[in-house]
Structures are given as structure tokens and as C-alpha cells.
Amino acid sequence: MPPIGWRGTYAGIGVIIAAAVLPLALMMRRRPPAAVYEQAEAATEAARADVGISPRFLLILLVLAGFSCCTAMSMPQVHLVAYCGDLGYGVARGAQMLSLMMALGIVSRIGSGFVADAIGGAATLMIGSFMQGVALLLYLYFDGLESLFVVSAIFGLFQGGIVPTYAIICRELLPPRQAGAAIGLVVSATILGMAFGGYFSGLIFDLTSSYRMAFLNGVMWNAFNFAIVAWLFWRRQRRTPAGAFMTA
């Protein structure tokens, strides 16, 4: 990175992604046969009946959940380096913590996929949301160098798998012909949440000269996300036989 700077690095990443994703997208452009849509629609309609709410209301809830979870998630991701600088550890240590967090986020994304296959998207999202909230709380009580590395590792192990589970929930509960638009809306909400959360946390720091209230703000947004996901899980769990939802 030093020879080209962070701007050049980002530009290079963009070029690599465009060169890789566009050909891969063209390879998968063919639509599934109509019979596949009909089978999938029957399955999602039954699952939606278990939850007992309309597709539109469900989509609104998922958009709100996506926005709130990423508003919370953005606090450490955006401000961890500056936070370490304020604590006197230096921005280089903060960058190392952030790299550790992001690396474990990759592990989290893959691992969450295996977990979702076993217990379903909503249950996986609920676990990830809860543990992300726990990690945010830990940032409030531990500010030693070693402990911050540990907390950042915990945060990374659970935050990375949260966003992909929204696509799984959309696929499980929303009509297949609407899945593309639904996933696009929910993922867009997560991106807006990341932008808003990063800015708002910085604004809180500017007003209070402390990251403590910024972390508390993240905890509150995370609690809102957890409440939505737990409510969806509870509604389906109470309307299905024991264990049925966990293997959906």
C-alpha cells in the first residue's frame, strides 16, 4: 500500500472486483426453470404463514433490522483506529486490530453459512446480533491493548456473518420472484446504516470528546436489531412444532 497510497489501493480493489464479478455474473445470468419457481414459492408461502405477517411488512422489518445492525457495526469498524490513537496506542495498533477483525469476519461469513444450513437464517442472525452486542459492551469495559485485540477478535467472529443471513431470510420467507429486489433493498439498508453509524458515532465523539457514548449508541442500535430478529424468530417458533424452525 505505501507506494500507491490508500486511494490507489481502493481504486485497485475496485478494478479487481469489477474484472472478477462481471464475468461471474454473466455466467449465472440464466433464470431457473418455471417449475423451480413454483416449488420454491410453495415452500416460502408455508414458511411465511408460520410467521403470520405480510411480505411487505416482513420486508420493512428486515430493512429496519439491516439498517440498525450496521449502524451498530460501523462504530468499531470506522472508529477503532482513531480510538486506539486516543488511548495512546497509536494508529498502527488500531490498524492491526481492524485487520484482525476483518480477517475473522471472513471466517464468520463462511461459518455462519454452515450454521444457517443447520438452524435457519433467523436463528443464525439472532445469535450473531446478540454476540455483536456483547462485543460492543465489552469495548465499554476493556481498553487495555491486549484486551482490545481480544474484543476486536470476538467482534469480528460474529459481525462478519450477519449481513449474509439477511439474504438467507429473504430466500426463506419472501416470494422467490421478489427475492432479488428484497435482498437489494435490505443490503442497501445495511450500507446506509454503515454510513450513518460511522458519521453519527463521529458526531457523538465531537460533542462529548469521548467514544463511550458512541459505543453506547451502537449498543442501543444493536438492541433494536436484536428485538426485531428475536420477535420474528418467536413468531415463527410459536406457530410451528418444536424444532421445525431450527431446521428450516
Language-model features, listed with the residues they occupy:
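Helix-to-loop junctions at the C-terminal end of transmembrane segments
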Residues: S108-G120, F205-D206
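A late C-terminal transmembrane helix in Major Facilitator Superfamily
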Residues: L173-S210, N217-G218
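Helix-loop-helix hairpin linking two adjacent transmembrane segments in secondary transporters
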Residues: M1-P33
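Intracellular juxtamembrane helix-capping segments at the cytosolic ends
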Residues: G161-L174
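Extracytoplasmic gate region of multi-pass secondary transporters
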Residues: P55-F114, G197
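C-terminal ends and interior cores of transmembrane alpha-helices
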Residues: M131-D143
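Flexible cytoplasmic inter-helical loops of multi-pass small-molecule transporters
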Residues: R29-R48, R239-T247
